[in-house]
Design a protein with these regions (language model features):
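Membrane-embedded transmembrane alpha-helical bundles that form the catalytic cores
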Residues: 1-465
Length: 466
């Protein structure tokens, strides 16, 4: 069930909120758990048991790890829990990738399992992993209430596509959280910002990108239009979902971590990945990079650790060689910055912005490709090596049609709109006008977005496949 869908907006969410707020405090987590299981079962009923198995093993091993803390058995239980989590993830997400790779390399014909990817498995697996690891490290107490832990792992606002919420971030709020009209209003506003990003921007850029993929009239201009459209689509799609998730969390009394901080204003790839999908980046830092030694064991080991983390990041995004290459793409850029480029980029920030946007754009062309050959072909065409004409009538038509929206998208991907609103609020008169108009800022995107949804317009969600 997509957040940007009629069933969610007008049936599931109102019913879930009504029952949740009507329930007594001691039953709210149980209501959340049931609502989350229903939400998951709506789109993936056959894999709901898989998520429950992941929750049960995390709950049981968490208790055993805490019970035997400071003993060898604690590490054994941690290892078993990690193996179960990664085993489930590996089997359902990577088995066919492994088999097809073996077939291609060895010339075999091993039968593929042809498993469909369980929705959200990459996200809830990482939450269970962080929970048992934090219990082992003594950074959080094991949760003895199964319903509370299950509600944390399956919490529907962030179940499908994050942010990746660590147990320690919400442990206190699972036990006791406050609800208020102002918090709910804040949540509604944040949700509608994300909804507008998704329906009014991401979907429109996605439609333009899909036109390029289906056209026979290619040109250098059209490839660049596609690349820019996809760059904006993936940002507004994913950051919009994160905004909706954070907003839903506030409605329910939770504070989820921020996931995006205007990544396209970055002046280096290093800065970009501190601003993009921040909950995933911090997860890999704390649970893989630092345990591998981080930067504590010399420069060579640090560079190796970066390479390992980015191979894992690529694979986390998808079971395909294009994602492995995408991870390597950013690993190489980060290594080059670590070795030599960062001082230059920090000194010349304008150059840094151009460099970052250029290489991030090429990276996301690879991210979106069905094969390495397709990515090379598209990138080659962008650089003028594909033998394509510089322009075409179709490319010019779509540039004129989508030009204003592309400019709007570029501006909205910067802090400029937020800065303008903040400046207006310093004026008493302007602030009063904004307060009066605020309901319209919520209602208009809802009406426009609903019109698009009812019309059956283009409405995919990119990160559901992870």
């Amino acid at each position: 069930m997509l957040f940007s869908s009629v069933p969610f907006l007008f049936y599931f969410l109102p019913a879930a909120l009504l029952i949740y707020f009507a329930a007594p405090r001691q039953l709210k987590n149980a209501v959340l758990l049931l609502a989350s299981l229903f939400f998951y079962a709506w789109g993936e009923p056959k894999y709901m048991l898989l998520m429950l198995v992941s929750i049960v093993q995390g709950y049981g091993f968490g208790l055993l790890i805490e019970k035997h803390r400071e003993q060898k058995a604690s590490k054994v239980f941690l290892t078993l829990s990690i193996l179960v989590s990664l085993g489930l993830l590996g089997y359902f997400k990577y088995a066919d990738f492994f088999l097809s790779s073996v077939n291609a390399v060895a010339g075999l014909s091993l039968p593929l399992l042809k498993l469909s990817l369980p929705i959200g498995i990459s996200f809830y697996t990482f939450q269970v992993l962080s929970y048992v690891i934090d219990v082992y490290r003594g950074e959080t107490a094991a949760q003895r209430n199964f319903i509370d832990l299950a509600a944390y792992v399956s919490l529907f606002p962030q179940l499908i596509a994050g942010p990746i919420v660590r147990y320690s971030d919400v442990a206190a709020e699972l036990k006791s959280r406050t609800h208020s009209v102002s918090a709910a209003a804040e949540g509604v506003r944040r949700f509608m910002v994300g909804f507008a990003k998704k329906i009014l921007l991401a979907n429109q850029f996605g439609a333009l990108a899909s036109v390029y993929k289906s056209t026979q009239d290619a040109s250098v201009l059209f490839v660049w239009l596609y690349a820019l459209a996809f760059l904006l689509q993936v940002y507004f799609d994913f950051s919009g979902y994160s905004d909706m998730a954070i907003g839903l969390g506030r409605m329910l009394g939770f504070h989820f971590p921020e996931n995006f901080n205007y990544p396209y204003i970055s002046a280096s790839i290093t800065e970009f990945w501190r601003r993009w999908h921040m909950s995933l980046g911090s997860w890999f830092r704390d649970y893989l990079y630092i345990p591998l030694g981080g930067s504590r064991k010399g420069k060579a080991r640090q560079l190796l650790n970066i390479l390992i983390v980015w191979l894992a990041t690529g694979l986390w995004h998808g079971a395909a060689w294009t994602f492995v290459l995408w991870g390597l793409w950013f690993a190489v850029l980060l290594l080059l910055e670590k070795l030599a480029l960062l001082p230059v980029l920090e000194k010349h920030r304008v150059l840094g912005h151009v460099y970052t946007l250029f290489f991030v754009t090429l990276g996301f062309v690879l991210f979106d490709a069905d094969s390495a050959a397709q990515a090379v072909s598209r990138i080659g065409a962008m650089l003028g090596a594909g033998g394509l004409p510089l322009s075409s009538a179709q490319a010019v038509y779509y540039l004129k049609s989508y030009g204003p929206l592309l400019v709007l998208g570029i501006l909205c991907a910067t802090p400029l709109p937020k800065m303008i609103v903040a400046k207006l609020r310093k004026s008493k008169g302007a602030a009063t006008v904004l307060d009066v108009l605020e309901p319209l800022f919520v209602l208009i995107p809802l009406l426009l977005g609903t019109a698009f949804l009812v019309d059956g317009s283009f409405n995919p969600f990119l990160y559901f496949r992870f």
